[in-house]
Design a protein with these regions (language model features):
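Short, solvent-exposed loop/turn elements at beta->coil junctions and helix N-caps
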Residues: 95-102, 169-173, 214-220
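Rossmann-like S-adenosyl-L-methionine
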Residues: 189-321
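Short, conserved phosphate/pyrophosphate- and ester-handling motifs at nucleotide-, phospho-/glycolipid
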Residues: 14, 143, 252
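Terminal RNA-binding accessory module
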Residues: 1-54
Length: 321
């Protein structure tokens, strides 16, 4: 507009739109779509009822209005543009993109908990876009189906607790077999009655209940037998990686399988090969690489992750690698 670039939230290439201005800078403006006069061929109807770009819309994802294959193409373009604008680098060749499921692929999330009297009580969900407010969401087509189905019942559970004002977050993690853990961040110790309700919820929904009174390393299961119950599978390599619900893992297990397989295939490791994996974490690459190489060295700064990676190597018969 008038020779100035305008970035418009919610608009797609080739569309004619009417937008509202959000802010103006010397070299560009920011705006948000208010109506669409001519739609792009890649625009689709969002599946989520609270997806959008206006006030109150969910900040959990940003591309449901774009056809799934076009989303991948767009992300690829963003990567190439960033490499050039920041690093002045252009790839000599590009691998074909990896595609995965469009819906219910997110196996981990941090959900904010807020008791909001103006909205009728407890909310459990993602933040609204560009806001500290919690979105009034009752389902989520991105989270795994079982977790999406828990969102409204979780509101009822938290509402019934004496410490509902002292429980700011619920972290959710789902294993490759569907096993689910709920980590309740608590700023005050739950009462005996609170614990009974939490455990009853876990039994009803088939979820392991964890408490986190302080930082991530303080997270612990109410039942110690569930300490390493969650796991993800890499069947091509015969590897299972156990993890705590607060550990870093890829949110999309299906894509992770393909990514690990492709990376190791590209490495083309000889049988006598030696490999170093920096920032190895739980061993997402280290352990499957160990099934191909003669020796692997995993380097990681977190003592807890190192300990769990060692146990993972032993459990998968790779301790000597």
């Amino acid at each position: 507009r008038d020779g100035k670039v305008v970035f418009i939230q919610g608009a797609l290439p080739g569309e004619d739109v009417i937008y509202e201005e959000l802010r103006s800078k010397s070299s560009y403006d920011m705006g948000r779509v208010s109506s669409i006069l001519k739609e792009s061929v890649i625009r689709v109807k969002p599946r989520c009822p609270v997806f959008g770009f206006g006030p109150g819309s969910c900040g959990g994802c940003a591309m449901q209005h774009i056809e799934p294959l076009a989303q991948v193409a767009y992300k690829e373009k963003v990567l190439l543009d960033t490499l050039w604008h920041i690093g002045k680098v252009r790839p000599e060749s590009m691998l074909s993109p990896i595609y995965g499921p469009t819906w219910h692929y997110r196996h981990r999330a941090r959900l904010t908990v807020r008791d909001v009297a103006k909205k009728g009580g407890v909310l459990v969900g993602f933040h609204e876009k560009a806001s500290s407010y919690v979105c009034d969401m009752r389902e989520c087509p991105i989270l795994t189906k079982n977790v999406s189905d828990m969102l409204v019942p979780l509101r009822g559970l938290v509402s019934s607790l004496s410490i509902r004002q002292r429980m700011p977050q619920i972290e959710v993690a789902v294993g490759g077999d569907g096993r689910t853990a709920l980590v309740f961040r608590t700023l005050e110790e739950p009462s005996g009655e609170d614990m009974e309700r939490l455990l009853a919820f876990g039994r009803e929904w088939g979820a392991d209940i964890w408490l986190q009174p302080k930082g991530p390393e303080s997270a612990h299961p109410v039942d110690p037998a569930n300490e390493e119950a969650l796991g993800l599978e890499l069947p091509e390599f015969g590897v299972r990686i156990s993890f705590k619900p607060t550990d870093f893992t890829q949110v999309n297990h299906e894509l992770n399988e393909v990514m690990v397989s492709r990376a190791i295939r590209l490495l083309d490791i000889p049988k006598d090969g030696k490999v170093a994996d920096f920032f190895c974490g739980l061993g997402n690459f280290t352990l499957p690489i160990a099934t191909r190489a003669s020796r692997v060295i995993g380097i990681e700064g977190s003592e807890g992750l190192v300990a769990r990676a060692r146990r993972g190597a032993e459990a998968n018969g790779l301790k000597e690698k």
